[in-house]
Structure formats: structure tokens, C-alpha cells
């Protein structure tokens, strides 16, 4: 395919038009008085959102060179969302400011490669200062503030703070759509996996359609049980203890399942059978997790263990097990605390080492089931459009809260970026002329988020930026009320990780943009000529 090539100024300015198109659409959403953007969907109702990365992903421009510029900035938003889960609009605003300022300097003759060094030095200094001014987050109230600011909704803030308090920092919090109008929290204590009873005759509560076992023994195996003779020895030992038993196996079928059901109906003993969760290697790992949590052993041929020789000390214990048609929940497993902690640490190490997003998600689920619990935020709304928008905001709030717990908080509303300006300005005396231009470029860009928040609130951005530069550290502009306040004291905070990621990613893409000298795009293909008209086919008039 033929290619279209543009060089130097032509290339950069074509891409800049794309950067501006995307950034201008995204930046209207920043701040408490930011607006929404409506996205057309091929099917269903349009999506109304103020989520930067969602807007950025939707933008496709007709001009291929402009589209490349837009995609570069979309990458900033996407990467920030991946690392911190929020701050995508801030990252986009910073990237646009750096690119515009940098392009002026490159056009005026600055060397882009040395300019890049100046940008890198300035951003490194800014990140050091951000780390120094960040404060750790400890109280439930502080967590609620972070979530409330991100979602622009205090009720959501309270909900997420409660979820994190209930399941801990390692717990899984999932967001689902509710059938009602209200948003509510549902917390599952203990370990839950997606496997239900193998026979409805095993239920103990016909109203709730669930089987509840108090202080049961738990037999865990990766084998398929089809012959009852294999497990009779261990069942006899459990019956002597007068306790119920939960059997977790690859499958239980035929004679074995029929015998368990028959004895349950006769009242001889209470047994519930479920299939093992997961598949393949993940199944083995999940069974090991369950064994660790309950203080039992996985009876597997890999370890030379056989069901016929299983004894009571190989079985796990828990204070309660509840089995429904689709799920099994094990509450208060009797596993050794130290063994559970060691298992948790192993999973944490695997999370850090894995490169697959899918594997990371599954490992985090396993970690939550061992270390914390699972909370489900059920999002309700009057219409489907509102539901989608609300769900996106709650996802952002949850990500922002996790980021805050990880690296602490800084003053919100772009204030922290203004606060690091003096430290970055001090670099000017330490760098060369073109590097100094790169530092000044970053200094100017650090003002951009506050400027945009003010402009979205109908104020003059430059006036507010100058006033904040003369205020003490931590004092910022509350765009919701139009007042200058101590941001942290008023609960207007940003996670340090979000601000850090936004600045780092914006600087990285801006530096790449400014050092671009040629841009190559595919030439649009010409449409093939249409078939000639088939008229004039005489002699066919009689055909019906």
C-alpha cells in the first residue's frame, strides 16, 4: 500500500490538530463544574460520561495524521487509567499543555533532544516534591473523601469507604448493575466460589433454597468420585464425630452421589457435595487456597494421597458453610494464621511478577478470598443511560481510593501541581539553556489543570493560578464554591499515585511527540469503479 509522508513542521502541526481535537473534548469534564460528553453508540442509547479515558477511546478522526496525534494523547489517558485507575482528564490536560508549549519552542529553534532532557529533569524533581508533600491515608473519613471527590457524590464516598473497611485493602470490590433505583452494598464474609450443590435434595432450608452446615468437616480432592466405597472410611469417621461434611471434588457422580443423597434424606448423616472451582492449574491453586484457609489437605495423587486412606486430620474445618444453587461460601476457616499469611504473600509475589492482566485479576480474586472478603456495589438508576454513567463514576472512585491507600493523598483540584512549582523552578540555575526551556515548559504545564478547572467554573484561569502561587502550600481554589481554602482540611484531595501517573505519562508522550521529525500514514485507497449499468438487455422482456 502507498504511504503518505510528512516532515518536521507539517508533521507536528498535523498531529497537534489531532491532539487539540481530543484534548478539547476531554478537558471540558475536569473539576466540580465540568460538563458531560455524549458518545454515540451503534446500538442502544448514547453514553453520557465525564470519564476522560472513555471519551478518548471513542475519538477517531478522518485525517490520518491528525488521528495519530489524537491516539498519542489517548495513550496518555489509557496508561494513566491502567496504572492508577483515575486522573485521565488531568493527564490529557497536562499532555496538551506540554505539547503546545514545546512545539512553540521547537518552532523557534530549540533542540528537541535537549528539550527532552529538561522535561525529564523537571518531572523527576516534581515527582520527588509530590512524594514529600503527600500524606498517608488512614481514617474511614479520609477514604470517603477521596471516593466522594472522584465520583462527585458523597453517598458513593460513604459506600466505598464502608466496603473497604469491611473487606480490607486486599479485598475484592466489584461493581454490578442493580435492578432497583438505589445503589447499595452487599458484602460476602469468608471465601466464596462459583460452584453450587450437585443435587437439590441436599438443601436444608427450602425457603432460601440453600444448604447450611454448622462446624462441618471439609474433604478437598482433585479426583472424580464415582464409587462410594472410596470415601466410606472417611465418612464413617465423620459420622462418629456427629458433624456434617462438605465434599469438594472434581466431580461426584453415579453411585457415590446417589448414596450421599439417600443418606441425607434418611437422616443418617448430612453431606453436601460441590464441584471444585476453576479449571486446570488454577483449580489446583484454588483447592490449595481452600485447604490453607480451612486447615486441611488437598487429597491428590500428586502428593501420593488416596481417598481410601484419608483421615480426619486431613479434612478442613470451618465454623459455617452455606451452599446455594450457584455458590459455596466458607466462613471462618480453621486454618493456621501463619500458614494463611505465607500463602497470601506468595500470591502477592505472583501478582507483582505476572505480565498478564487476566492472570493478575484472577490472582487478586484469590488474594481477596484468603485475606479479606468480597464486596459488591450494586448500582441502581432510573434509566439505562444514567446507570452506565453512574457505574463509570463509581469505578473511577474505587480506583482512586485504592490508589490513595497505596501512596497517600495530596491537595486536590490541581493544587499539588502548583505547590511543586518552586522546587522545579530551582532547577533553572542547574541546567543548560535548552534544558532550561524544557524546565520552563513543564512549569507552564503544571498550571494547566487549575487553569482548566477555573475556566470550566466560568472564572479567569490565569488570575486564579497567580493567586494560588502566592498562597501557602495546600491552599487551593474550590471551584464548587468559588473560595480559596485549605484543600485537605476541606476534604478536597487527590491520590498521590493518580497525580504522579498523570504527570509521568503526559511528560513521556509529550517528549516523544516533540522529538518526532517525520510521520508516515497509509494513503486512503480509491474506491473501485462501480459496475456499468446493465440496461439495454433486449429480448428478456417476456421473463416473469
Swiss-Prot record:
It is found in: Cytoplasm. Belongs to the chaperonin (HSP60) family. One of its GO terms (biological process) is protein refolding. Forms a cylinder of 14 subunits composed of two heptameric rings stacked back-to-back. Interacts with the co-chaperonin GroES. GO terms for molecular function: ATP binding; ATP-dependent protein folding chaperone; isomerase activity; unfolded protein binding. It catalyses: ATP + H2O + a folded polypeptide = ADP + phosphate + an unfolded polypeptide. The lineage of its organism: Bacteria, Bacillati, Bacillota, Bacilli, Bacillales. GO terms for cellular component: cytoplasm. This is Chaperonin GroEL. HAMAP family: CH60 (MF_00600). Keywords: ATP-binding, Chaperone, Cytoplasm, Isomerase, Nucleotide-binding. It holds the Pfam family Cpn60_TCP1. It comes from the Bacteria. Its EC number is 5.6.1.7. PROSITE patterns: CHAPERONINS_CPN60 (PS00296). It is an enzyme of class 5 (isomerase). ATP binds at residues 29-32, 86-90, 413, 478-480, 494. Its main location: cytoplasm.
